[in-house]
Amino acid sequence: MLMRWLSRWLARYLSKTVLRRSVSTATYEAIRDTLQPRDVLLVEGDARISVAIRYLTQSTWSHAALYLGPEAGLPAGEDGDPHVLVEADLEEGIRSIPLSFYRHVHTRICRPVGLGTYDLQAMTEYVHSRM
C-alpha cells in the first residue's frame, strides 16, 4: 500500500509543469494540415520528467505521440475536440488525446518511410487493441 501511494505521488510530482516556454517553429494549423495517419509527433515536453528525459538523452524531444487521425474511431473529448493522438502518460497510462493538447508546445513530425499498407494497418490495429 505504501509503494502504491509513493509511486502515485512520484508520478504526480514528475508530471507537474515546470517552466512553460514555447519556441514552436510551426503553427498549430500547419501541423494539423500536414499530419497524416501513423505519423509520429515529437514533443518538447514541459513537465519535470521531460527535463530529465531531454537531459539524459541529449535530445530536444522528451515525448512522442502517434497520430491516427479523426477516422481512427478514437473517442472525442468532452469539448467535442476529436482525439487523434495516442500517447503514454506517466499518470494515466496509454491514452488518446486531441491534437490541440499540444497546441502551444514545440513539436516536430516524423513520417514512417518504407512501411507497406499491411504494416501500417497492423500498427493501427495494435494500438487499438492496447487502448
Features from the language model and the residues they span:
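Cysteine-nucleophile amide-bond enzymes
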Residues: 1-131
